[in-house]
Amino acid sequence: PNYNGGNLENKGNNGATMTSIHNYFANGQDSSAISLANSNLVGVSDDAGTNGYGYYLSWGNMYIDFKNVSSNNDVTNYTRDLDLKTAIAGVNYDKGSTHYSRENFTSYPDNVIVTHITADGSEKISLDVSVEPDNSRGSAINGIGDSSYQRTWDTTVSDGRISINGQLTDNQMKFSSQTQVITDNAGTVTDGDGKVSVSGASEVTIITSMGTDYKDEYPSYRTGETASELTNRVKWYVDQAAVKTYEELKANHVSDYQEIFNRVDLNLGQTVSTKTTDALLSAYKAGTASEAERRQLEVMLFQYGRFMTIESSRETKTDGNGYVRETLPSNLQGLWVGANNSPWHSDYHMNVNLQMNYWPTYSTNMAECGQPLIDYIDALREPGRVTAAI
């Protein structure tokens, strides 16, 4: 079970069933072959129509409630951006005479998600941070019914850190996350009921790490960790990151990312346009974009694909404390999904879609990003022998 649901065991002597299906097809009895396959080969179904396969879902939501912004009318010059050269997402806006900036990135070397908020001007940062796993059922996509996915968890807040520990209800997979809120010397951090509050700060850094006891190893697919061992593992990563400055965390991330990303530079004669990406897309579709703008959008899309691969598929890493960090390959939605019922459940379609994810990996000099797929296929050999013997 890579996600909720799980790898249910076989339903019987499928070898004999396959022989009967072949005979039906050979005799032109297609409907009988299909009926037998649906009744004997397909896994046990649930109310989501997933045949017991399960699906990836979002971890949850982080809420950052800015206390000094009451409505959209309070801010001006609002922009959002993603810098493909650094893999850093940014938000910038002005409120009165104060400029607010927010940077977000996911660091592979430090195994944390980092949010950094600054205020430059007369106003100071005042906000609440909370984290909540998502138990919503989601909406039907591609004709698939609502998710029955549920989980239970406990949340504690201490010393500016939000700790969440829980378990999935259907396959008992454990999960844990920790979020540390840090301010500059001028700021005040206060623990609350399920949240951390900040006031009077010019700079805030939010560091999050998370983990589960999943391990891609037949037959248990579990690390064997106790709940406390999993919690300690997640805590270690946040502790290690929290003693570093934001600039150190950012430099680690950018250096690691660019070592792969900068290996390929595509030049199609593009020029940098002052238009926003959505404006470029509209002009491209309408046929009003210049040749240089069309080339810019095409190069951007090419590099965006490489960015997504680097950010969702990295090789196994052994950290300084001996923790081995394994990574599953990117699924049909990559890795970062903001919904609890994504198309195709963010699963792995072995027929061609999974391979398509990795087509550019080797040809654009990102071989290490292909290792999770190789490891995943290798891990299928042992259960595959069991299937072949049925």
Residues covered by each model-derived region:
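Aromatic-residue-lined binding/catalytic grooves and analogous aromatic/hydrophobic interfacial grooves
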Residues: 1-390
